[in-house]
């Protein structure tokens, strides 16, 4: 089109007012368990839970991770009722049920021993939730800064989309064992979105 304008074949771009849909999909990088294990060794108890929920639970971080309460954990049924702040405005959404996967269970057990009687929330870090209750919302929780420091302490190189990539890695693993629609119901996304990751 630009050439046609430059060569004076046409006087103006007939499509200049037409809006196109651009792809907003960003590429996630698979985060191996060995990398998460290195981070866990350097993480404090709060950050072990954040990492575990993000990588092994597939929770959206920070919104779902910081919203999960101990009352949302059904230890006997080995399930979590995950609050979904990002999509709660959609009809029929707001909470989803997800198994407590075997990799996540010991992390939650340990966190409950430490924080269960001290904190209403699974991630016992009220400063992150307080920061999120401001104009910029969840972005203000600023978990990325602390995650970057943790990566440095562990001697691990970062990857694009730190928390999205951990969630997407969990999705990839689960899809190897379970049907796509089941995994999507657990992780709270659609098959279309899952296949873009």
Range-by-range predicted roles:
Residues 16-17, 54, 77-85, 162, ...:
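Short functional hotspots where side chains directly engage DNA or cofactors
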Residues 5-14, 112-117:
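Proline-centered turn/helix-capping motifs that create local helix->coil transitions or kinks
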Residues 41-48, 57, 98, 110-121, ...:
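Short, basic (Lys/Arg/His-rich) helix/loop patches that form interaction surfaces
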